[in-house]
Amino acid sequence: MQSSSKTGASRRSWSACRIHATLGLLTLICAWSGLTAVSAAAASAPSHVKATQPLVALLYEHSAYSSPRTSAPLVASMWPKTPITGEQTTLPVIGKDNGRGGTRWLKVMLPGRPNGLTGWIEQGGTYSLVTGWHIVVNTSLRRVWIYFHGRLQRTFEAVVGKPSTPTPSGNFFVQETIIMPASEPGGPFALATSARSDVLQDFDGGPGQIGIHGRDGLGGTLGAAQSHGCVRLATADIDWLAARSRVSSSGADPLSTTTRCCT
């Protein structure tokens, strides 16, 4: 289990990773600074995807517990800024509890290991958001579907993880969207997700973090299972996707380099 999100990987350490996938679907929730992902078996584009997903943005560091009380075991410590770009940390909300003594709690999805990690955080020091964007990745068909408010917007062909390093299945979210330097593989953009490789505990100095990114400097045949677990898209497709997610260039003022999704 990854107990803290304080230590972030460099852009290269996760973006160069590749995921090998077994049969399944990866579904991503698209938050202001990320998307949500889910993996599961399917023969075609899902006919129904949830229209919206509630989110919460952190204003300061929060402790996530296994149940809605501070005496419960600590699951993770979440910083208010993402590790690579310094964007606002935004987490999908999957439950609520009014608690005792007036303390309100939120059950949220968390990044890191094990995949599917969740925890309870206090609602204080947060603000609410909502997203209508979802990404669904079918690793068997090697296809990516993009939904907005439950309606299919785009279908992309992808490179997914090879059998020895499969793309993990499950529900995840995009933590941050990164402009990749020309000298780094995986450009021109990379979406860092909350998922981690089930095979690689680390990769190129990073935590085996799964990304959705381009093929610059990497190649790979679209529609093939050839990566170490990450999902690679054609340049035009990752450009389109990145334009609908918050984007920040590492080392720059995130406010001056940020774009928000178009509706």
Task: Give short role names for the model-derived ranges.
Residues 123-162:
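A structural motif detector for short, solvent-exposed N-terminal "entry" segments of globular domains
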Residues 43-98:
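Beta-loop motif signature
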Residues 22-36:
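Bacterial N-terminal signal peptides
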Residues 112, 125-134, 162-173, 178, ...:
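Exported/periplasmic cell-wall-interacting domains
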Residues 43-50, 109-137:
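Boundary regions of SH3-family modules and the immediately adjacent low-complexity/disordered segments
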Residues 35-43:
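Signal peptide processing junction and immediate N-terminal pro/mature segment
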Residues 1-17:
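N-terminal secretory signal peptides that target proteins for export/translocation
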Residues 83-125:
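SH3/SH3-like beta-barrel superfamily modules
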